[in-house]
Amino acid sequence: MKLLGRSHLVAVAAVTIMALGVGAALANTQHHNPPRDGGKHGLHGQCSPAQVARNKANVVAYYTTAFNDKKPEEAVAKYGGPVYIQHNPQAADGFDAFIGFVKAFTTQFPQLHVDIKRVIGECNMVVTHSHITTSPSDRGQAVADIFRLNRQGKVVEHWDVIQDVPATSANDNTMF
């Protein structure tokens, strides 16, 4: 029987610790970051496939109307809920702040385009994976937006993760 070397043991220990940490993190996700509105604008329990489909369609329409059509007021009027909790540290809470941001961003970059590549929904949570470009020559950014919707299918909370599309990659895969 061949014994594992020190580097192999360290690697096995690291993988084991990471697996235990990920498992513990996943076990605690339901209670880790409760909605700041006390959950009164969210859904609880199970959702029907029709609710999930409605929520996904509403998020796509909300984002497309706001950014591609450059009509953030219309997007908020149709798809915004009574509150808008923002988790991007560079953006303020509230739909007025969202409207102001979209107007400033689309004025600065009139050729801005959001290409939603995929939409994932689970109950009142919807995730979009998008390629955002500011001009046809821009490599752009890969963006994952996470939205929470209320019982009426209106957007009430937002998180995002943004990564620049690099000029070169260590692999032949795209970010999309």
Regions found by a protein language model. Give the residues of each.
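Bacterial N-terminal signal peptides that target proteins for export
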Residues: 2-12
